[in-house]
Curated annotation (Swiss-Prot):
Entry protein name: Probable phosphoglucosamine mutase
InterPro entries assigned: A-D-PHexomutase_a/b/a-I, A-D-PHexomutase_a/b/a-I/II/III, A-D-PHexomutase_a/b/a-II, A-D-PHexomutase_a/b/a-III, A-D-PHexomutase_C, A-D-PHexomutase_C_sf, A-D-PHexomutase_CS, Alpha-D-phosphohexomutase_SF
This protein's encoding gene: glmM
Species classification: Archaea, Methanobacteriati, Methanobacteriota, Methanomada group, Methanobacteria
Superkingdom per UniProt: Archaea
Function: Catalyzes the conversion of glucosamine-6-phosphate to glucosamine-1-phosphate.
Length: 445
């Protein structure tokens, strides 16, 4: 039987009741249990999406039926699932979330015992078990047990606060998108000594205040609020709070690459990032910059392999190996608050980071068409540009030009898009590169 592809760059994700169903969740639970040897313990959490009520029951049933114990920790941020899996000595963790996707989406992400997301090799094993239906039920006396753990939230909060030293009174506005960080993130910042104003901090899976994707279009209210109350910093989370984006004291959204470079400067040692990160990383950090495929698990793997000090994606997904191998938007926000508290205004700190014209574009492309479009992308791009210095095909196709301009064309692993990311010290050239790439993609869809 052909193996069904379930996982993208960030777990399983799709539209509810068409791509992601209770049957799928049940059988993923059984498949995970089989992978674990029909024994052990799994931590289970979920974000604020309304459809998590049914998915939670379904995947839990699959795990229990197959002999695995389940620890439910309820509605929590994704990083708390990674943290709990590690601290409670579980064999795996499961988070039900579609992160920044709209309300009609949901998904499943699986975590290792150390709090790191499942690797692509592990996900492939789950897909093989799922596709072949090679999972089995256990006898009645070997069915897994279910318990609820509410104490781990408090432990997580205390450990987060202990990671930073923020001067009392820093004014912070936190926009949680009505997502999984709504309860914990503001509480953590208050316990850390900040004066906190909240936006969209009532959990609601319909995301009534704003779309959970933390970008400039969706953060207009946060930008205005930071200026209106004279705050030092704005923090925006996505739907499950594994990401964080900042607004400076002037109400401006921080450039994603520059923000990552600013935090990376604080660490000695090597830094891991992805192929879509900009030149400012290489020009700012103390150690080596190691690039890998997009996706937090890819960053985590290289952090472990190279014993790196810190890692992250320009999207605001940052990993702090001194805390947990799960990306943590709340800790990322705390560390930015600590930086502003001790070193000055965010806008001025960002001026220290080199900044060049950077363009991010996305072209709608169905899942079925993405593979075909990307098949010949390297040749199409090579035929369209004549000053190429280097080609990197670790994740999509990245061209670096003789003047260090670069462009990355890659299929989204979570949505129906092909993404273009590019950077050049010459804004005219940046625009020309973008137009050429858009034309190539549209002509081949």
């Amino acid at each position: 039987m052909a193996v069904k592809k379930l996982f993208g760059t960030s777990g399983i994700r799709g539209k509810i009741n068409s791509e992601v169903t209770c049957e799928l969740a049940l059988n993923v639970g059984k498949s995970l249990a089989c992978y674990l040897g029909n024994e052990g313990t799994v931590v289970l959490g979920y974000d604020t999406r309304t459809t998590n009520v049914m998915l939670d029951q379904a995947i839990c049933a699959g795990l229990l039926e197959s002999g695995v114990d389940v620890i439910k920790i309820g509605m929590v941020p994704t990083p708390l699932v990674g943290y709990a899996t590690d601290k409670l000595g579980a064999d795996a963790g499961v988070m039900l979330t579609a992160s920044h996707n709209p309300s009609q989406y949901n998904g499943i992400k699986i975590w290792n015992a150390n709090g790191m997301a499942y690797t692509s090799a592990q996900e492939a094993k789950i897909e093989e078990i799922y596709s072949n239906e090679s999972y089995t039920s256990v006898s009645w006396d070997k069915v897994g047990s279910l318990r609820v753990n509410e104490e781990i939230k408090g432990r997580y909060i205390d450990d987060l606060v202990g990671m930073v030293n923020i001067k009392p009174g820093l004014k912070v506005v936190i926009d949680c998108a009505s997502g999984a960080g709504s309860e914990i993130s503001p509480l953590v910042f208050r316990k850390a000594g900040c004066e906190v104003t909240t936006l969209n901090s009532q959990p609601d899976g319909f995301f009534p205040g704003r779309n959970p994707e933390p970008n400039a279009e969706n953060l207009q209210n946060l930008m205005k609020t930071v200026v209106a109350i004279g705050a030092d910093l704005g923090i925006a989370h996505d739907g499950d709070a594994d990401r964080m984006i900042t607004i400076d004291e002037n109400g401006d959204i921080s450039p994603f690459d520059s923000l990552l470079a600013l935090m990376s400067k604080e660490f000695d040692g090597d830094i891991v990032t992805t192929v879509d990160a900009g030149l400012c990383m290489d020009e700012s950090v103390k150690g080596n910059v190691l690039r890998t495929k997009v996706g937090d698990v890819n960053v985590a793997e290289v952090i472990i392999e190279k014993d790196a000090a810190f890692g992250g994606e320009p999207s605001g997904t940052w990993l702090h190996p001194d805390f947990c191998m799960c990306p943590d938007g709340i800790l990322s926000g705390l560390r930015m608050a600590e930086l502003v508290s001790n070193k000055g205004k965010l806008s001025e700190l960002l001026l220290e980071i080199p900044s060049y014209p950077n363009i991010r574009e996305k072209i709608i492309c169905s899942k079925e068409a993405k593979t075909a479009v990307m098949e010949n992308m390297e040749d199409l791009l090579k035929d369209s540009f004549d000053d190429i210095k280097e080609i990197n095909s670790i994740d999509g196709v990245r061209l670096t030009f003789n003047d260090d301009s670069w462009v990355l064309v890659r299929p989204s692993g979570t949505e129906d898009y092909i993404r273009i990311t590019l950077e050049s010290k010459d804004s005219t050239k940046a625009q020309a590169i973008k137009e050429t790439c858009v034309k190539i993609i549209k002509e081949n869809i």
